C-alpha cells in the first residue's frame, strides 16, 4: 500500500517550513486564474478575517478557513513537485508578495513582524530566519519563459513594468490595488488581515511517495471536485512515458505546439480543444478495434484501460499530431491534400445539423 503524509497546516506553517521547496512541473496546466477568481478569493478571505465586518468577532484560537488540498511528491532533485493545487498556491504567493510590498516599508512593530513572517513564506531562510532573496520557495516550469520570468521577478522584487501583461502580473496588480483600498477603508485593521490569512487559513498538504501515487490522488480529487480536463490527465501519462525514455523536452515542446494547433481548429461546446482531439481519436481507435456498440463510454474511461496502455507508445502521440494536422487541412481547405471533389463534400458536411460526421 502506498504511503501518504497528510497533515493539515496553516499557510504560514506550510510555506515557512525549512524543507519547503515547491516546483510546478512543466506537464501542469498554465496558470489560469484571472480577476474573477482573485476577487472571489479576496472576498472570501475578508469575510473570514472580519466576520460581519467586525475585526473583534474573529477568534484567532479557533477560527479556520479551509483553502483546499495541495498534492505533491518529492522528485529526484528533492523538490516538492505540485500535482494538484498549483493555481491556489501560486495565487497565495502573489497575494503574500503584494502584502509584503506594502507592509515591508512600515516601521511599527506589528508590520515588522508581519513582514518577517511573509519573508519566511516566500524565500528560503538561514538558521536565524533571515531570507535569501535570491532563493524562492517556489519555481514554475509550466509557463512560457516570459511568463515564468514575470512570475519569478514579481516574487523576487515586488515590482512590475507596464509591458508585463501575464496573468501573474495582472493578478498581482489586482491584489496591490485591493490592499491599498483596504488600508484606506480600514486603517485600524491593517495588521490583522495578512496575519489571519497566514495563521488561520488552512491547506491540506498530501505528500505521496511517488509520482504515480500523486497522479492517482490528483485524478480522484478532481473527479470529485472541480474537474481538470481529460487531456490534462492524458498529458501526465504521456509525460511519464517520454520522461522514462529520455525524451521529456521533445515531448513538452510537441505538446505545446499541439495545444496551439488544436486551439485554432476546435471550438467544442464542452471540454477543451485538446479533449476534442482525444475524442476524435477515440472513435478512430474504436473503429480500428472493431467496436460497433452505439454506446460510447466516457473519454477518460476509454483511455485508462489497461493502465493507460494506449498512451504509453510513440505511435499514439504521433497519430494525434497527424489527426490534428488532418483537421487543420480540412479547416483551411488544403488543395494540396484534397481534390476539388473532396473539398466540395467537406463543404456540404460543414452544414450538417450536428457534428457527428467528424467522428
Where are these regions (language model features)?
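Polyanionic (Asp/Glu-rich) segments that form extended negatively charged tracts
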Residues: 135-359
Amino acid at each position: 500500500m502506498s504511503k501518504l503524509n497528510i497533515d493539515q497546516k496553516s499557510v504560514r506553517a506550510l510555506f515557512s517550513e525549512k524543507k519547503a521547496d515547491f516546483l510546478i512541473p512543466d506537464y501542469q496546466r498554465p496558470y489560469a486564474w484571472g480577476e474573477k477568481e482573485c476577487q472571489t478569493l479576496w472576498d472570501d478571505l475578508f469575510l473570514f478575517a472580519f466576520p460581519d465586518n467586525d475585526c473583534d468577532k474573529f477568534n484567532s484560537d479557533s477560527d479556520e478557513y479551509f483553502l483546499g488540498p495541495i498534492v505533491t511528491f518529492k522528485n529526484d532533485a528533492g523538490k516538492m513537485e505540485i500535482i494538484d493545487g498549483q493555481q491556489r498556491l501560486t495565487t497565495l504567493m502573489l497575494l503574500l508578495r503584494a502584502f509584503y510590498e506594502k507592509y515591508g516599508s512600515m516601521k511599527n512593530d506589528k508590520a515588522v513582524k508581519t513582514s518577517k513572517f511573509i519573508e519566511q513564506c516566500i524565500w528560503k531562510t538561514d538558521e536565524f530566519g533571515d531570507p535569501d532573496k535570491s532563493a524562492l520557495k517556489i519555481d514554475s516550469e509550466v509557463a512560457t519563459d516570459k511568463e515564468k520570468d514575470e512570475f519569478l521577478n514579481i516574487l523576487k522584487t515586488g515590482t512590475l513594468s507596464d509591458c508585463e501583461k501575464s496573468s501573474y502580473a495582472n493578478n498581482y496588480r489586482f491584489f496591490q490595488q485591493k490592499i491599498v483600498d483596504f488600508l484606506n477603508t480600514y486603517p485600524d485593521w491593517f495588521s490583522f488581515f495578512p496575519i489571519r490569512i497566514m495563521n488561520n487559513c488552512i491547506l491540506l498538504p498530501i505528500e505521496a511517495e511517488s509520482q504515480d501515487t500523486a497522479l492517482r490522488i490528483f485524478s480522484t480529487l478532481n473527479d470529485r471536485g472541480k474537474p481538470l480536463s481529460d487531456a490534462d490527465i492524458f498529458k501526465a501519462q504521456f509525460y511519464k512515458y517520454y520522461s522514462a525514455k529520455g525524451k521529456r523536452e521533445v515531448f513538452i515542446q510537441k505538446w505545446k505546439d499541439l495545444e496551439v494547433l488544436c486551439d485554432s481548429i476546435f471550438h467544442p461546446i464542452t471540454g477543451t480543444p485538446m479533449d476534442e482531439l482525444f475524442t476524435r481519436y477515440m472513435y478512430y481507435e474504436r473503429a480500428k478495434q472493431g467496436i460497433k456498440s452505439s454506446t460510447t463510454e466516457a473519454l477518460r474511461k476509454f483511455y485508462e484501460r489497461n493502465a493507460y496502455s494506449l498512451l504509453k507508445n510513440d505511435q499514439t502521440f504521433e497519430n494525434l499530431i497527424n489527426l490534428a494536422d488532418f483537421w487543420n487541412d480540412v479547416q483551411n481547405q488544403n488543395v494540396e491534400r484534397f481534390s476539388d471533389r473532396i473539398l466540395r463534400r467537406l463543404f456540404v458536411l460543414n452544414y450538417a445539423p450536428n457534428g457527428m460526421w467528424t467522428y
